[in-house]
Amino acid sequence: MRPDGTRVRDLTAIMQALPYVMPKRYDAQNWAEEYLDEDAIRDYIRAKRREGRTVTHMSLLVSAYYRAVLKNPKINYFVMNRRIYKRNHFCFSFVILKTRADGTPDETSLKVYLEPDDTVFTVTEKIRSTIEKNQNVRHNNDTDRFAKFAFGVPGLARAVFGLAGFLDRHDLLPRSIIELSPFHTSQIGRASCRERV
């Protein structure tokens, strides 16, 4: 059993066949373009800020998507090795830009886990505290340390990531590695540099 999900067995024959018909990620990838009323979003954010409550665009969109996942859990399914799994949590990854001690820019990936009772305000706080903790110049999160280790020795990255891929395909990848990976997630987003948290 995978640490990040359980196999879905009560699928129709068509659903079970889809990973075979579309075996590559790009075969089944869905892209959607949605236009939102930005004025309504800005008005909501301003109204909440006047009340003394901080809300960001990112936290608002993540919260809305999470509510959709709670109403339709199949959105949070994933495919590994042509088998369909139900993710046993909701998390989202995003990348932030931070500055190194020498002043050069660097980026790091972050992962935030949500609970069913989270609101737009608790999501905002979780994002803010995660960014704040990881913007420290001297702070490297576990993902940064793992990447530095993997790329520290020539040829090691290929072996490390090859082994991780093998373990993942056979449902043996440890939870600790899944928690490090920004790609084992329900949603990947990006934080705008103009957005104030």
Predicted regions and their residues:
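C-terminal catalytic/motor cores of large multi-domain enzyme assemblies
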Residues: 1-197
